[in-house]
Curated annotation (Swiss-Prot):
Natural source organism: Sodalis glossinidius (strain morsitans)
A Pfam short name: Rnf-Nqr
Main location: membrane
Name of the featured protein: Ion-translocating oxidoreductase complex subunit E
UniProt keyword Cell membrane, yes or no: yes
Membrane topology of this protein: Multi-pass membrane protein
Biological function: Part of a membrane-bound complex that couples electron transfer with translocation of ions across the membrane.
Length: 232
């Protein structure tokens, strides 16, 4: 398995930042009330991860170990500010919906963790790919949880997609079933905790099934003291 494929597989599944490392749970639980909000924040976080990892990797030779963390935070804050202005300019409805959680990307453990653990020790191309894979893994988790909560809570899917993608995206709205009274448990943070719990269980079961399908490695035979060999 080459390095690029391993990085993608690690970020998307094996070492998923939300389902394995359990990082970034604050925005995961607070913003995933709709699929649109989840997708918007996930894409913003992915863009920040790619840009931050690339910048940290490119500057790693000139960043001394004693002051590396403050410099990483400054780089992350600069990128997040640029992304925030882009969302404000081109997706103002989404900007209002996400609110404080866009600037809070600066304090996201996923971003600073990848800058410290991976980007500071790898070339820019691999660092950018790592940021992309980690970001897409987090986005997929956000999107799945947001879609689950939106369907159970409001009976819709991608409601308000025009806030993210423009007026044409109104056609993406799907009404799975009609309801006059939203299911508040699914829309509130307790529903996010419950949904995340089911997703963790689902990933565990899938991993166990995949492990069971793998051929068992030959186990070495350990002879006890005094036990004769088979050919003796």
């Amino acid at each position: 398995m080459n390095e690029a494929k391993r990085i993608l597989l690690e970020g998307l599944w094996r070492n998923n930042s939300s389902l394995v490392q359990l990082l970034g749970l604050c925005p995961l639980l607070a913003v995933s009330n709709t699929a649109t909000n989840a997708l918007g924040l996930g894409l913003a976080t992915t863009l920040v991860l790619v840009c931050t990892n690339t910048a940290v990797s490119a500057l790693r030779r000139w960043i001394t170990g004693e002051i590396r963390i403050p410099i990483y935070v400054m780089i992350i804050a600069s990128v997040v500010s640029a992304v925030q202005m882009l969302i404000n300019a081109y997706a103002f409805g989404l900007y209002q919906s996400l609110g404080i959680f866009i600037p809070l990307i600066v304090t996201n453990c996923i971003v600073i963790g990848r800058a410290e653990a991976y980007a500071s020790q790898r070339p820019p191309a691999l660092a950018a790919l790592d940021g992309l894979s980690i970001g897409l893994g987090s986005t997929c988790t956000l999107l799945l949880l947001g879609a689950l909560r939106e369907v159970l809570g409001n009976g819709t899917l991608f409601d308000g997609a025009d806030q993210l993608l423009g007026a044409w995206a109104r056609v993406l709205r799907i009404e799975v079933f009609h309801t006059d009274t939203p299911f508040l448990l699914a829309m509130l943070p307790p529903g996010a905790f419950i949904g995340l719990g089911f997703m963790l269980v689902g990933k565990y079961l899938i991993d166990q099934r995949m492990k069971a399908r793998q051929p068992k490695a030959a186990r070495p035979v350990v002879l006890q003291q005094g036990q004769p060999l088979a050919d003796e």
